[in-house]
Amino acid sequence: MNELMKIFGQVSGTQAFDQIKISIASPEKIRSWSFGEIKKPETINYRTFKPERDGLFCARIFGPIKDYECLCGKYKRMKYRGIICEKCGVEVTLSKVRRERMGHIELAAPVAHIWFMKSLPSRVGLLIDMTLKDLERVLYFENYVVVEPGLTPLKLHEMLSEEQYQRAVEEYGEDSFTAGIGAEAIRDMLMSIDLETLKTDMKVELRDTTSEAKRKKLVKRLKIVDAFIESGCRPEWMILEVIPVIPPELRPLVPLDGGRFATSDLNDLYRRVINRNNRLKRLIELRAPDIIIRNEKRMLQESVDALFDNGRRGRAITGANKRPLKSLSDMLKGKQGRFRQNLLGKRVDYSGRSVIVVGPELKLHQCGLPKKMALELFKPFVYSKLEQYHYATTIKAAKRMVEKERPEVWDILEEVIREHPVMLNRAPTLHRLGIQAFEPVLIEGKAIQLHPLVCTAFNADFDGDQMAVHVPLSLEAQLEARVLMMSTNNILSPANGKPIIVPTQDIVLGLYYLTLDREGEKGEGMAFASLNEIEHALQARVVSLQARVKARLHTIDENGAPVIRTVETTPGRMLLSRLLPRHTALPFSVINRLLRKKDITDVIDTVYRHCGQKETVIFCDRVMQLGYAHAARAGISFGKDDLVIPPTKAQLVADTDAEVKEFEQQYQDGLITQGEKYNKVVDAWSHCTERVADEMMKEIAKIEPGKPVNSVYMMAHSGARGSAAQMKQLAGMRGLMAKPSGEIIETPIVSNFKEGLTVLEYFNSTHGARKGLADTALKTANSGYLTRRLVDVAQDAIIVIEDCGTSRGITAMPVVEGGQIIASLGERVLGRTAAEDIKDTDGTIIVPLGKMIEEHDVELLEEAGIEQVRIRSVLTCEAETGICGKCYGRDLARGTKVNIGEAVGVIAAQSIGEPGTQLTMRTFHIGGAAQRGAEQSSVEAAFDGKIVMENRAVVGTSENVLIVMSRNCEVKITDEAGREKARYRIPYGSKLLTDEGRMVTKGDRLAEWDPYTVPIITEREGIAIYNDLVEGVSVREVTDEATGISSKVVVEWKNMPKGTDLKPRITLRDDRGEGITLANGLEARYFMSVDTILSVENGQRVKAGDVLGRIPREGSKTRDITGGLPRVAELFEARKPKDHAIISEIDGRVEFGKDYKSKRRLLVVPEDGDPVEYLLPKGKHLTIQEGDYVRKGDPLMDGNPVPHDILRVMGVEALANYLIKEIQDVYRLQGVKINDKHIEVISRQMLQKVEITEPGDTTFLVGELIDRTDFQIENEKTLKENGRPANSIPVLQGITKASLQTHSFISAASFQETTRVLTEAAVSGKSDSLMGLKENVIVGRLIPAGTGAMMNRLRALAATRDKEIEDSRGAEMVPVLGAAESFTPRLPEPPAE
């Protein structure tokens, strides 16, 4: 009885510990785990099938094979429990002890552990200061090593070959020095290490050393010595004397039919080790010659290596079928390893899968579950109910009833299923909406029915997709499924806070058709008194759905009082108005318009924000019913004739053809270069394609009274299916195609699919199609991998506290590009916390500090015309672990303040990773087929207003045209109140058509420029003189073969024999031949970069604003622009972009220094202080001229900057803004909306570490990477002891690196490089306190997020209670049942809202 009580008293296995520690096992430890030594390589006796004694499956060591039965059968049954049989030596107990009891092998010679030997950096090598190569030569018996030189001239750790060793013995005598070979020598060396003295010596050396390489090495060694001291491991434990043998049930031997056996590879590997070990023992007993013993020892070392990590050194040992054997390391590694296969992802019971079909008559919270499936899934519940209602007396009887499918079983199934939610999942589960809970409705048939509105979230369609069903069993699980995962509770997308339950396809089309209004329809001008009248009229066919009529509408006014208004509308819209909830924020005007997909989404959003969740769900369901009904009634379909080919198409194509011929002629005459011709041709055709498409849309969109609206147009315009781009290919012209390399083929496809393509056109178009398919396959895998890395880096970002109390934040501004505001300020600050009082121009506070900015606040901000707002950000949050609620702001999926315990890191990772599959894989050349229309060559005002110039540097030409001379000139348009409406970047060399203070109206041209060349322009009048422009060295006359026209082009001069010191430039002289100086006091000289085409002759007179040379754009721009997924990955991995830009670290003027062989020297000279020197590759196009003033962080040349540089020069906020901008650009191009805070969360995880620059009195070392929180804690500790604190700089790490450096070694090991992570953790004796999500999943606990966070808090509460009770009873010490006693701790009172 006592034993039974013990079973109840046990705390469940996973809850019984707080942390997991890993360290190196000492030989004593290994022996203490073991239940006996394994001496024989035999496994089981092939006749009796019983395990051999002392073999790998020995029952005496590992326990009985059958429950409570010894091997010889003398003792059977429970009553002999615990007795050890004297005949066969087997303990009578449960057979499952064979899963937990270990054995060991005593090795006849020590053997090095391959993980500590080979995994880089080699731990053994660092400790005894030998290279890996030397170590291996000693280990595998090639060389001797001097362990103790004595008084001989030999050096410590010197390598001696066999002959050298023999010679040394003869010369100095055998006892004068010690040299060893094999693992014994290394073990002796490790044993002689005194860690403490080594540490002090190294610290002294580190202080005195001057060489950088030496310092790095010392720091590495110091770290390892420190690790050993802290973990309490001894270095010689890295050399094994005993090997543990894992329990036999974990490496089973299963009999197959036909007398053969299937076995785990580990048994082979163990047998090898045992055989060699036994042979070695015998050889030593026999006193065999040294060389034989040595060979045997080497073989033993190799077999142990193979057991631990097969294939790490030398060739992998293969089994009978030439396949490498799976070693212990392989069991853990990779997708099929223990971590990812069995611990992070398990297969679950009570689940099924089937094809899905559409279920339009379901409610949003329902799904149709096939009866057969439901019966199987809910079997235990059905059995219990059958017994409860006395239909069956035993489970067996109940089982028989269910198998026969008796009628009462179905009734009971109905009852069991009522209000018991099930979870549906569609693979791939890319974000959390890929699993949602529904209430099952029993249906006939074998397919699961899915509600159409949740298809967007699941990314499901009904072309054969399958979904899996899971049943939450426990009450808690059902509760969570209902409250958190029910489809009705997931109306908003966690990525951007917009509704994700949106009508698509047919529903959109139906609503569009319903809300069309057309002239000349039947019943136009009628007036109706009520909705019922309208319905009668529609049924009697007196009036059409789309006629313009007047109707009386019952609605509410601004204050919510019921009123009756007369409205001009259509019968269709009136039908829709019946569904709209009554609310002041939802006037009739929201639906009294043509509803396209986006409009419907907006309506749903408004309903959700103002009327709450329940109303929204009902509204969506009814809208869906209405949409389907009318899509069916409308009978919209299309035929070939609906695709109207524009009559002007032939003319447009002919015109463009003529234009292209003219370009061809200009090229023949030598007026333009090959590259310019290509650009112009491509542009002309792009333009033509667009014109044809526009004409086609005009034709198709024509609405004539009495004729039905064009069906294709309706589908595309409503957003149901198809797009203008697809229609363009069907009825316009296909346009230009790209080659596989990404270049555009000059000849376009003039035909469309309706006319049909010619053979040549068809051939040209296959390129793109094939590339598309190849891309898609690659993309999916890459995107999945990106998501995995993101989840891994962010998994421990959890909301832990309400407010961290920081005053820091970041500045939010609207995103402006090409003059258009892409993301308004409101969009960026909505749902964030204000980091300071936001004031109007007159000083009234709009939003106080610490308040969350809601929708109505955003309206106030926009009215006040505020340009920038300081908001709290995850990046500046000062919570010690995790993130605080205030810095995060609104939970996007709920629209309310974020809850404590929300796993925001994983949500961020999913939100960024999920659209990954939509991003392109292509790396564009400037001008990938779809990527560019005509090059932009001018800017036009988008608003009326007044011009304000920034960085205005212009020069007036003789014709009084203003030419922009500044590299970063911007034109702003402001309204009367001086608020910025738009801003445009004006490139260098543009003609400025307006000026400071002028008024412009919308559509005015502000500036124009040549899009294909970058000009080099003079600022003064004078005579142009060539300098270092040497014919045949730095300048070549290039004659175009096709045209015979020649032009002077600057060529790559630094490879020429005479050209190394040249600096090709044009200088200006006045009439007296003296150099002209510019306004900034420097002489007027203009450097010519490679490929510049000279526009002036030597000695020619030039006026201000004249062009001296043109740099063709393709010359400076053939760099690929990395787009799409690769760009996102490059940013998150913090890689240096190829052809990266160098940025200035200080403000100052630019000067050119003396050049080196292949680099140009550029100096930035500040007002005061030392100039900073940069080396730029020669011939790269610089974005600046000599004498320009650059600001800190400005790029000095073309290209993307390196994120690390931005962090170093400009700080964390600038880096965050850069990352957000760049990543958002990629997603915006695909039309994907992601909230900034997700990118901020990932950026925070990338910025967790700091690099020590000055250790002060702390224990840190220079250059060490330390976690930010650890750094602060250590500094506070040092300050308390009146020491000097350490200094550090923030470090940016890529997501892979950051994941591998997390606090938790379990999480890192399950991500990548498992052996390396575990080796490192073992050496430093790390303990994992199970703070993140992954570690807890692996040990089988609730994750510390959401409801799990609450459980953790309760557990901590209970533990402190127990401790208090125990302390108070300390005197009499009554035994207290701890966590086993099931009591509900009182929850702390909820704070008053």
Swiss-Prot record:
Keyword annotations for this protein? DNA-directed RNA polymerase, Magnesium, Metal-binding, Nucleotidyltransferase, Transcription, Transferase, Zinc
Q: What is its EC number?
A: 2.7.7.6
> Which Gene3D superfamilies does the UniProt record give?
1.10.132.30, 1.10.150.390, 1.10.1790.20, 1.10.40.90, 2.40.40.20, 2.40.50.100, RNA polymerase II, clamp domain (4.10.860.120), RNA polymerase Rpb1, domain 3 (1.10.274.100)
SUPFAM superfamilies noted in UniProt: beta and beta-prime subunits of DNA dependent RNA-polymerase
| Cofactor annotation remark | Binds 1 Mg(2+) ion per subunit.
Top-level EC class as recorded in UniProt: transferase
Q: Does the UniProt entry include the keyword Electron transport? A: no
Q: Superkingdom of this entry's organism?
A: Bacteria
* GO terms (BP aspect): DNA-templated transcription
Q: Where does Zn(2+) 2 bind?
A: 804, 877, 884, 887
Per UniProt, Mg(2+) binds at 461, 463, 465
GO MF entry, a single one:
zinc ion binding
Reactions mediated catalytically: RNA(n) + a ribonucleoside 5'-triphosphate = RNA(n+1) + diphosphate
Q: Where does Zn(2+) 1 bind?
A: 70, 72, 85, 88
Q: Which GO terms describe its cellular component?
A: DNA-directed RNA polymerase complex
| Family matches, as Pfam families | RNA_pol_Rpb1_1, RNA_pol_Rpb1_2, RNA_pol_Rpb1_3, RNA_pol_Rpb1_4, RNA_pol_Rpb1_5
Essential cofactor(s) = Mg(2+); Zn(2+)
Return the similarity comment.
Answer: Belongs to the RNA polymerase beta' chain family.
Q: What is this protein's function?
A: DNA-dependent RNA polymerase catalyzes the transcription of DNA into RNA using the four ribonucleoside triphosphates as substrates.
Q: Which proteins does it associate with, and in what oligomeric form? A: The RNAP catalytic core consists of 2 alpha, 1 beta, 1 beta' and 1 omega subunit. When a sigma factor is associated with the core the holoenzyme is formed, which can initiate transcription.
Full protein name: DNA-directed RNA polymerase subunit beta'
Q: What is the lineage of its organism?
A: Bacteria, Pseudomonadati, Pseudomonadota, Alphaproteobacteria, Rhodospirillales
Q: Which gene encodes it?
A: rpoC
